[in-house]
């Protein structure tokens, strides 16, 4: 475990260096480069030719330290999920360590470093693929095609909506540069009081959360419901068997947004493994 903390601190130093490179590259940028943002009120109202430097300091802008795979990290180090007591303590310890690093950098530089729960898209599968090539297939770590976003409960874990929100809320208090939680639900059109109950719980107990459902449509047969995935990660209509992507609309939330585009293999596998929380 000692080696883990040593490597983590080495990587944090590298992250700080990378973020400072980004900050320094922006210094001296004239407002003319994007008038709608810097001159016309999108972000500020600077004069023509005025540099944006003042807006990069004193916490006005954010240098985000992102992270994915808290679940996989806990599995790799302890062999358990971070929803167990032992795993939860370790995950929170790591998260607080990341936050402390951001706070320290902020104090040293006066810049707005923040800890950000990353909604990785291609990154979620890329990192997993690279680690699998380097370290081999590790159970509950690299044996899938994706890493879990930020601090989220793994999509395959059986947990009800309220327990999931309660568990993840404690990470919201640490990941102040950005955080969000989700619950997966079936068609709730005939059970709106239950939706209201979830929303009420979110309002009173967690910083930011959203509800996911599956409002898919097959344009060939008119089926509405959940378009399924077969073993080859191909979408098909469970009513008529249609596999033509142009003849269906599959709606899922990825990276915080509900969209109907098709996704990479890693994200598609993650979507297929999501369990319902109600």
Each model region followed by its residue ranges:
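Long, C-terminal-biased catalytic regions of enzyme "large/alpha" subunits
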Residues: 1-278
């Amino acid at each position: 475990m000692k080696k883990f903390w040593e490597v983590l601190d080495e990587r944090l130093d590298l992250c700080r260096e990378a973020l400072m490179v980004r900050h320094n590259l922006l210094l001296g940028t004239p407002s003319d480069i994007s008038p709608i943002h810097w001159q016309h009120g999108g972000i500020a109202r600077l004069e023509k030719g005025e540099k944006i430097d003042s807006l990069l300091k004193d916490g006005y802008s954010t240098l985000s330290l992102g992270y994915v795979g808290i679940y996989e990290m806990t599995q790799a180090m302890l062999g358990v999920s971070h929803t167990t007591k032992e795993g939860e303590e370790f995950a929170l310890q790591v998260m607080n360590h990341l936050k402390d690093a951001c706070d320290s950098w902020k104090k040293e530089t006066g810049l707005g470093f923040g800890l950000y729960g990353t909604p990785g898209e291609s990154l979620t599968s890329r990192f997993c693929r690279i680690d699998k090539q380097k370290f081999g297939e590790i159970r509950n770590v690299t044996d899938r095609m994706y890493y879990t976003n930020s601090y989220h409960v793994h999509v395959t874990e059986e947990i009800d909506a309220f327990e999931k929100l309660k568990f993840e809320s404690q990470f919201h208090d640490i990941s102040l540069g950005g955080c969000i939680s989700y619950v997966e639900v079936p068609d709730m059109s005939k059970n709106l009081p239950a939706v209201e109950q979830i929303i009420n719980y979110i309002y009173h107990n967690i910083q930011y959360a959203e509800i996911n459902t599956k409002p898919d449509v097959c344009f060939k047969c008119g089926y509405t419901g959940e378009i399924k995935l077969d073993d080859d990660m191909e979408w098909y209509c469970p009513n008529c068997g249609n596999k033509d992507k142009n003849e269906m609309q599959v709606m899922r939330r990825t990276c915080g947004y509900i969209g109907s585009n098709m996704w990479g293999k890693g994200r598609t596998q993650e979507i297929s493994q999501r369990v319902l929380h109600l």
